[in-house]
Regions:
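DNA major-groove recognition helix of helix-turn-helix/homeodomain DNA-binding modules
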Residues: 2, 61-79
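A short, Lys/Arg-rich alpha-helix, primarily the initiator
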Residues: 3-29
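Short basic helix-loop element that most often maps to the first helix and adjoining turn
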Residues: 21-37, 97-105
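Short alpha-helical DNA-recognition segment
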Residues: 31-49
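Residues that mark the N-terminal boundary/hinge immediately upstream of a DNA-recognition element
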Residues: 33, 59-62
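Short, charged recognition helix plus adjacent turn
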Residues: 77-106
Length: 106
């Protein structure tokens, strides 16, 4: 049985790598050993290493657990897609377009 390979767009991988680096810097600024953060997050040291590298194969829950272990930084996840300007514009366009009722048979 082979492992499923995660296909990630280059721009997305850049974002994940940057996020992983920021998580690592947050841990280092707090002078927290990797072993302690991994234990607090309930993950292995290897998984923490993958989080800090921005690996796309790591579950979103692991990223959230690590952020929580860094003094409740997981609350920042609430900011993801909060301002969906493009989605709102699409929704507004749909609301402006008049929809006709289906023709009655008879």
């Amino acid at each position: 049985m082979s492992k499923r390979k995660n296909v990630v767009m280059p721009g997305t991988q850049d974002i994940l790598s940057q996020m992983g680096e920021q998580i690592k810097l947050a841990r280092l600024r707090r002078e927290l050993p990797a072993e302690l953060v991994a234990e607090r997050a309930g993950i292995s040291r290897a998984t923490l290493w993958n989080v800090e590298k921005g690996s796309p194969s790591v579950a979103m829950g692991a990223y959230a657990a690590v952020l929580h272990a860094l003094n409740n930084m997981d609350r920042d996840l609430l900011l993801v897609a909060k301002d969906d300007e493009f989605g709102r514009k699409l929704q507004d366009l749909g609301l402006l377009t008049r929809k006709r009722a289906p023709k009655k048979e008879g």
